[in-house]
Amino acid sequence: MSLAIIKLNFEVKKKLNIGTKMKSTKADIPFKKVTINGKEVAYIPGSTVKGILRTCAIRIANLLNLKVDSYSVYPSELRRNKSDIICELFGAPDKNSKIIIDDAYLDSNTEILTHVRIDDKYQVAKEGSLFKVEYLPIGSKFGCEIKCYNLSIDEMRLLLASVAEMNYERFGKAGLVEVKIGKNSQIPELYLNDSIIKEILGAMKDG
């Protein structure tokens, strides 16, 4: 079995919110939280990162001369028995994903900003429409890990190119990030010998 571990390092370039329906006493649209060693820690689900990567992969696959039949990121909208590279890499209702993405725990402090809803018809603030949103501010850093199982060369090319494309893709509620690939990534030699993969890694390497 071929296993590659790709470490992603993110820096927020435009304030970032990942909306959730969980209850919060501080914000109407908070980050998800988990308690670790008695402390509440905000995190970004790995499924969120995976969804963004899938969106990027769909958009750029043709640049790598890869055929795409599945243009949705929602499992319920995917037809069964699809075998294009998107479903092979990211999974489908009848197909396991070849990648697992860990949740990204946030070391940086979040901030809460108050907003007001605007009446689209009259372009004025709606009465009693104040709401609070929890953001990760500009300059905040976080990371996560992608475990890749038995990827073909084409699949690894597409995955790494999709990571690069994340620099231009909306992250959460209109956020933007800069993403780099960590030096401590573990990528087998069979991938490093590929010129396209080597070029992407060279451009994306952190530091």
Where do the PLM segments sit?
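Small/polar/charged residue-enriched interaction surfaces, especially the RNA/DNA-contacting tracks
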Residues: 1-207
